[in-house]
Every structure is written in structure tokens, then in C-alpha cells.
Design a protein with these regions (language model features):
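C-terminal catalytic histidine-bearing segment of alpha/beta-hydrolase fold enzymes
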Residues: 123-166
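Short beta-to-alpha linker loops that shape the active-site pocket of alpha/beta-hydrolase fold enzymes
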Residues: 4-7, 89, 144
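Primarily recognizes the serine-hydrolase "nucleophile elbow" in alpha/beta-hydrolase
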Residues: 55-102
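Short, proline-enriched alpha-helix->beta-strand connector loops that line the catalytic pocket
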Residues: 101-106, 134-135
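Serine-hydrolase catalytic machinery in alpha/beta-hydrolase-like enzymes
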Residues: 1-52, 56
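Short beta-strand/loop motif that positions the catalytic acidic residue
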Residues: 107-110, 114
Length: 166
């Protein structure tokens, strides 16, 4: 799985799809659309190179990666199989609700002690999906900060096995 394309300004050892620091919601949305195009290009390249259909593609991400995979996965006209999201949020619910083109399988997971992306973001995403008649799987990890616990990796693998026909 590829890393995001940019070095992270807030955490030099990490990567980012775009800079979230000191940005207005409009700037974040604009930058997320550029990142979405990059991810769509990658998905299309992987599909072509490996002779895959979209329903053979599962995308996922942590934190900002979750944000981009949710936005991209729901907006693609050729539905990817699934989206796995850890510790993220929906970047712009109004934009996303107006641009939904597909209904992939979705699981969202979040730590209850996350101080980087608040648990409120998880609850807002869960509410968004409910309002838009999505049936999604969710998991809140107790005593978990901004990370993917071992249980989260296991749940992600179980989700893939459940939804991916091999």
C-alpha cells in the first residue's frame, strides 16, 4: 500500500495527502479534491496493470488516509469493493452528500481517547452514513489514542475476508 505523497508538516516522519494546518474548510476541501484525483489515478493504474475490476479493489487509510479513502470511495462511479477507515473523519459532509456515486462496504474504527481526530468526528461520520441509508460496520476502541491497535488490524482483515471473494 502506498504512503500519502507528501511529507507531513506536523510529523516529519509521517506522510500526508495535503496540509491540514492553518487551513480554512474551503482550502481543505480544495486540497482534498487534488488528493482525491491522485488516489483515483492510482486506483485506475492498479486496475489496469493487474486487469482488475473496481469490485476487486479495497481502499483504506488511517487518519487523513481515512478521510481521502472515504471521499474517494463514495464518489467513484465504478464502485470499489470496500473502504476501511481508521481514526478519520468526513472532510465535508455537504460536498460528499451531493457527490455520492456508489455504496461500497464500509467499516470505520476509532479510539475513544483520540486527541488528533476527535471521537466526535467518528460519531458525525456514523450519523452521516445513517442519514444517507448506508449500513456500515463500526468499532470504538476503549482506552485507545490516535493509532491502530492490534484488534483494529484484525478487524480490518476479517472485514476484507468477509467482503472479498477470492
Amino acid at each position: 500500500c502506498p504512503d500519502a505523497p507528501e511529507k507531513c508538516a506536523a510529523s516529519p516522519s509521517g506522510f500526508q495527502w495535503f496540509d491540514l494546518m492553518d487551513q480554512t474548510p474551503e482550502q481543505v476541501l480544495a486540497k482534498s479534491l487534488v488528493a482525491e484525483n491522485k488516489l483515483n489515478k492510482l486506483i485506475d493504474e492498479v486496475k489496469e496493470k493487474n486487469n482488475l475490476s473496481a469490485d476487486q479493489i479495497i481502499i483504506g487509510g488511517f487518519s487523513q488516509g481515512c478521510m481521502i479513502t472515504l471521499q474517494t470511495g463514495l464518489k467513484r462511479k465504478d464502485k470499489v469493493n470496500s473502504v476501511i477507515g481508521y481514526s478519520g473523519r468526513i472532510i465535508d459532509t455537504e460536498h460528499l452528500s451531493k457527490n455520492i456515486n456508489s455504496r461500497p462496504n464500509i467499516i470505520l474504527m476509532h479510539g475513544d481517547l483520540d486527541q488528533v481526530v476527535s471521537i466526535d468526528s467518528f460519531l458525525e461520520a456514523k450519523e452521516f452514513f445513517g442519514k444517507n441509508n448506508y449500513e456500515i460496520e463500526t468499532k470504538i476502541f476503549k482506552n485507545c489514542e490516535h493509532r491502530i491497535p492490534t484488534e483494529g488490524s484484525s478487524l480490518g482483515l476479517q472485514f476484507i475476508k468477509k467482503h472479498f471473494n477470492t
